Each structure stands twice: as C-alpha cells, then as structure tokens.
Amino acid sequence: MAMFHSLPSIHVKHQKNTAELESVIMPVPAEVTISMSQHIGAPCKPVVKVGDTVKVGQLIGDSEAAVSAPIHSSVSGKVKAIEQIFNARGAKSEAIVITTDGEQTIDETLAPPAIGAELEDVLVAARACGLMGLGGAGFPTSVKLVGLKSAAIDTLVINGAECEPYLTCDYRIMLEKTDLLLEGAELILRHMPGGRAVIGIENNKPKAIEKIKADAAAKGSKLEVLELKSRYPQGAEKVIVYEATGRVIPEGKLPSDVGVLVMNVGTVIKLAEYVKTGLPLTSRMVTVDGGAVAEPKNVWVPIGTKLEDIINFCGGYKGEPAEIILGGPMMGTSCRDDQTPISKTNNGLLVFNEKEAKMAAETACIRCGRCLRACPLSLSPAALDRAYHAEDVEALKALHVNLCMECGCCAYVCPAKRHLVVYNQLGKQMIKK
C-alpha cells in the first residue's frame, strides 16, 4: 500500500513556551515512589526490603527477562514501603516508596564502566545504566543495541525532532549537553563500520541546529544534522526514518528491518554520560507547562517524584486545574491525579485549565476526507471508524489498523470531532480477541 505523501501532515501550534528557559534542578522531595514497571517488557522485582537504607544509583529493582531494564534509587534514604500503585502509564504496578534523607549520598560502588573495542561492553553498560528510550516508548536500550551485531544496520538516526506542542526538554538537552550528544553518537558509530549517523531536528530549533553543526565540525564528528520541516508528526519513528533515509518500515516491522537504529537524543546523551560517570538513570528533564501552572519550566526531576511536588516547585497551580497530561497533548496520557510518580519515559507534565482541556462534542462523520489527507501513513481513519463501530474485524485488518501509530493527526483536523485515535486503539484490541 502507499505510505507517506509529499504534502505536510498537519501544522499544530508549537506552544514552545519554555524553549529559552535553561533547565533547573528541583530540590529532593520528602518521598519518592519508584514504579517497577517503567519500560516495555518484563517488570522488575524489588531487590531491597522495607527498612533498608539506599543510596543514589543503588540497584533496587531487576529482572532476569531478556527484555527489561534495571531500576535504581533516585535518592538516598530509607525504604518505607513496597506497594501496588497506578503508575504513569495508568496501569497497576509494584512500587518502592523511599523516604529521603536530603543528603543524596551516591552509592560508593558506582564507577564508569570498562568500555573496550567489543560491542558487548556497550550492551552491558546500557543495561547497567537502566537505560531505555527516553522519548516516550521506553524500549530497553541494551536490547535495541543488540541489532548492531547485524551488519545490515548501517544508519543511526537520532531523533531530535520534538514535534509535540509544548515540549522543549529535548531542545534544551541538545543545547546544554551537546558534547555528550556527539560522544554518544561516536560511541555507537564505532560498532557500525562504514555507517552513517544523522540527527533529525525540526527547523523551528535553529539554535540547536547551529550549535550541533558547529560543535560537530570543531570536534571532527561524523554526526550529520538533518533539518526537518516543522510539521507534525515529524518525530514519529516511521516518519523520521523515511525523512532521513528514504526507507519505508513495512507494517509489523521495525527500523532494524530496514537497516536503521533509531534513538532519542536524550537516550544517546545519557548513554555517553553513564560511560563517563557510572551514574545510572535516576533523573530526567521534564517540560512542565500549561495554563494551570504558575511558572512553566524545564526541570531535572528525580525518578519517582510525585507530580504534586513538581508542580509545587513550578509555583503551584494557577487557578483551577482541569486536566493533567503526561507527555505531549497529541500523544500523551491523561493522568488520574497529581499523586502519580514521574517515570523514566515522562518527557512532559502539562496542566491545563478548563478552557484548554475542554473537548468539543462528537458529531457524525461528514465524509470530508480531511483525516485521510492528514494521515502521514495514508490510512483512512473514517473508514476505520466505521469498521470499528460495525465490529468488522476483517475490514479493520484490510484497512491496516495495526499500522496506525496513534499520532492524533486525524482527530486534530476532524470537523466532527470524532475520537478517531481511540477507535483505532479499540480496533487493534478487537483484532487481538
């Protein structure tokens, strides 16, 4: 089937309100709640018990499963409880509650990993770091990097597009940690003989483009900078692979099947940082914004910090909050309440007021075709809508519902305000039954 088209997908209001604000580090909260399920794959099991004293970077959760990533304490303090919570994905998971001591004492056993000429050293380091995709998906990095054992992978695509409205944490980290970005790219390129590394950045981020180009030239880095048009969903995996290489990822396949390794910019930077310092993934930068936040910021947050504590650090609520979203407004998830703890994959915390959160009433499809023209994969969302409501599983398959990447373009442009993404999600579940 045809995929992609020459016309832009959709243009959304950028709302990059925090783009020029340097990141800040929030104080350690009184308590953190660290979920044992923060990644795609098997959840971790606690390796500490109630009453144990823990330090920053200490291993507190692990799994023997092939697809998983260990979890480390983001604070120093004492384990208060091990309990079931609703995590940032809205699912129930086991979690470790730690009362902090305010000292942030680092685990003395931590040390930079030994990185030699073998790829295995990098795989071991990525796993020991507890690293996963920091752009939202959360796939364990050590598992993804196994693909480098195949000579078929010849291109590293670093995703710096950050096309979601409001979010600017990737932009800030590109500006603030450019050296580590280049070091991370070179580390991966060593295990991709004759390979190419390219970072895709939307052209509404000229400072990042210019800085990375200048620093790469000064250091003799092989990293190429690809200026992307500012359109949504430019940062979607299938889209950025096509833009960077001209290759199309077939339905049901991965970037590795077309010779590409895709990594978020924050993931590459953290890998390089871990190789230098030996400090695992215990904190991340989060964009905090929205009309119901008093002081929007880009904040370095200890993993497991409650949303309430982050919002209070940003001046508290401005008026009455109507909705909390983790991630961006297009693909993020609505949150139960502000007691939810932040996870490794949460790049945004948006707090909307009633005006921003208000949804228009859904009406009948008028068959205008806007959703079809907006879809970057040339699917037919209106036809999928009808197939779902008719419970026509064969039609859902024929219309390639599983190819939908749930970017939200169709629902964004729909004049009838149809919940098209939701129907595609439910359609996928219908096929599995």
Predicted regions and their residues:
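N-terminal, Lys/Arg-enriched amphipathic/low-complexity engagement segments
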Residues: 1-47, 97
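Conserved hydrophobic positions within beta-strands
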Residues: 77-79
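Internal alpha/beta scaffold segment
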Residues: 115, 121, 172-220
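Gly-rich Lys/Arg/Thr-decorated short loops/hinges at beta-loop-alpha junctions or inter-strand turns
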Residues: 133, 156-170, 292
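Ferredoxin-type iron-sulfur electron-transfer modules in oxidoreductases and energy-metabolism complexes
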Residues: 347-362, 372, 376-433
